[in-house]
């Protein structure tokens, strides 16, 4: 049994410690906002926050999480998250939407840490997120 704190709630899941966090989030907890894209931490669709930092949940095992606090797209809140989500919609960013949760999670982490990022900061923070339909 593995103990996880997801979105501020404590869970105990019956999982092998090597199970990717992504599958615990989606299959065991039913939180499907976090997407599976490539499975090799290259596309960013599976991005969640671990203690406020963006990580790729497809390559992070539940055993690696330890006492960390995981936040998924379902639970991001606060002014930064609300602003990013509003601008995302206002600027018609979503097309197919597959990359959207990972893109938003990376953007929220960036703006939370750096209120005035440069173009280079933005490129660096978002470079791990790929968009299948190329609308980003």
Predicted regions and their residues:
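Signature of N-terminal electron-transfer/Fe-S-associated modules in redox systems
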Residues: 1-136
